[in-house]
């Protein structure tokens, strides 16, 4: 009798995606982050669902409903902090996943890469709207500042901002719609992730060497299922250490002050995972220019495949490109640090230099260094 796993229409899909999938024999731990992102998404959807059962999206009661969850709901505090810190883990995995793609040339699978960029934007939008929901000071002022950026769009900007707000300022209508969008987006992200996986399985996974691995494949199960489970255990361990020992480590103390439109916090800043983009935004004195730089800081990933000038796919055997890659990582860490600092000397100058370097590395230096490496190898 034929195995039902391979014949039943539903189990066949699961089988071909997670069990009998031919995978390269040499993919390293850097290939774990796809499954870890899936686990993060599941954790966020489940904790978010339970939070939504007790949360009220009204300006008068939003802050106290979050307090109620933490104080009165059974294990509400752990659900709330798992959700808040789960977002941080999500972004850590996202950044490492994108970094892996850049380092090993995975961006050459252009469909998978482009869906990935759309996913990144969707997750960033979801996280931003989620940060507004507790209705603390940083929630309110963060929402005001970031939505206000759209007013830089010529002609329609002001109308667009007021349309998004549902009034003349961030208020009850804004909070209600942000909650609605924050609830629906993770399900859209799930669908996009399935498409991301569909496109990936059209080509098969890349591997550290960047060389086609058709001649050396192993089944996904048990080799990579056990490897993914190990990664998942590390992820959950890290998340629970964060939740149980220092749940507010990555948050902002200002968000424990209820939102007050009459009192502006001294330093308005987003969550840590947006600081690099926020630093790029602030480093340009012009409002529209800053907004364009902010969008392009992520959108620049879309043109990376077009700028691939090397004859090798991966950076594994390209020491000069490796140096440049780690310079980019250092630059992003610098931008993250600058984004959390006040707008004063010398932080402004450092931010501007780091922003210029970021775009220089990706758009100019990487392609040039790749050509130099080709010539060094007499190709």
From Swiss-Prot:
Cofactor annotation remark: Binds 2 heme b groups non-covalently.
Key words, A-Z: Electron transport, Heme, Iron, Membrane, Metal-binding, Mitochondrion, Mitochondrion inner membrane, Respiratory chain, Transmembrane, Transmembrane helix, Transport, Ubiquinone
Source organism superkingdom: Eukaryota
InterPro entries named among the record's database cross-references: Cyt_b/b6_C, Cyt_b/b6_C_sf, Cyt_b/b6_N, Cytb/b6-like_sf, Cytochrome_b, Cytochrome_b_C_euk/bac, Cytochrome_b_N_euk/bac, Di-haem_cyt_TM
Principal place of residence: mitochondrion
Biological process terms in GO annotation: mitochondrial electron transport, ubiquinol to cytochrome c
Cofactor field: heme b
Chain residues that bind a ubiquinone: 201
Role played: Component of the ubiquinol-cytochrome c reductase complex (complex III or cytochrome b-c1 complex) that is part of the mitochondrial respiratory chain. The b-c1 complex mediates electron transfer from ubiquinol to cytochrome c. Contributes to the generation of a proton gradient across the mitochondrial membrane that is then used for ATP synthesis.
Family as reported in the entry's similarity comment: Belongs to the cytochrome b family.
PANTHER family xref list: CYTOCHROME B (PTHR19271:SF16)
Assembly and oligomerization: The cytochrome bc1 complex contains 11 subunits: 3 respiratory subunits (MT-CYB, CYC1 and UQCRFS1), 2 core proteins (UQCRC1 and UQCRC2) and 6 low-molecular weight proteins (UQCRH/QCR6, UQCRB/QCR7, UQCRQ/QCR8, UQCR10/QCR9, UQCR11/QCR10 and a cleavage product of UQCRFS1). This cytochrome bc1 complex then forms a dimer.
Protein name: Cytochrome b
Gene source species: Mustela nivalis
């Amino acid at each position: 009798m034929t195995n039902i796993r391979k014949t039943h229409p539903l189990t066949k899909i699961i089988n071909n995606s997670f069990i009998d999938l031919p995978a390269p024999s040499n993919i390293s731990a850097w290939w774990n982050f796809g499954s870890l992102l899936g686990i993060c998404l599941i954790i966020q959807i489940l904790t978010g669902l339970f939070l939504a059962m007790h949360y009220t999206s009204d300006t008068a009661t939003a802050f106290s409903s979050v307090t109620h969850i933490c104080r009165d709901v059974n294990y509400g505090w752990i659900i709330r902090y798992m959700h808040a810190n789960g977002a941080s883990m999500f972004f850590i995995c996202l950044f490492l996943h994108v970094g892996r793609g850049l380092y090993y040339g995975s961006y050459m699978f252009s469909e998978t890469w482009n869906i990935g960029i759309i996913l990144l934007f969707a997750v960033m939008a979801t996280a931003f709207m989620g940060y507004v929901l507790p209705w603390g000071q940083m929630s309110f002022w963060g929402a005001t500042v970031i939505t206000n950026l759209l007013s830089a769009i010529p002609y329609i900007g002001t109308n667009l901002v007021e349309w998004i707000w549902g009034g003349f300022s961030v208020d009850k209508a804004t909070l209600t719609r942000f909650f609605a969008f924050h609830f629906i987006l993770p399900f859209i992200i799930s669908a996009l992730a399935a498409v991301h996986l569909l496109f990936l399985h059209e080509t098969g996974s890349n591997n550290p060497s960047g060389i086609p691995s058709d001649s050396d494949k192993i089944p996904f199960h048990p080799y990579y299922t056990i490897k993914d489970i190990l990664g998942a255990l590390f992820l959950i361990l890290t998340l629970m250490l964060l939740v149980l020992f220092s749940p507010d480590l990555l948050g902002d103390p200002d968000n424990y002050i209820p939102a007050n439109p009459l009192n502006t916090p001294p330093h308005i800043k987003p969550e840590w995972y947006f600081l690099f983009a926020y630093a790029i935004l602030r480093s340009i004195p012009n409002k529209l220019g800053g907004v364009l730089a902010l969008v392009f800081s992520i959108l620049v990933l879309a043109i990376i495949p077009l700028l691939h000038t090397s004859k090798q796919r991966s950076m594994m055997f390209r020491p000069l490109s490796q140096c440049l890659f780690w310079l980019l990582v250092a630059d992003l860490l610098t931008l993250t640090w600058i984004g959390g600092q006040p707008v004063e000397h010398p932080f402004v100058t450092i931010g501007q230099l780091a922003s210029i370097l970021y775009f220089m590395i990706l758009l100019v230096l990487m392609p040039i260094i790749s050509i130099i490496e080709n010539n060094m190898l007499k190709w």
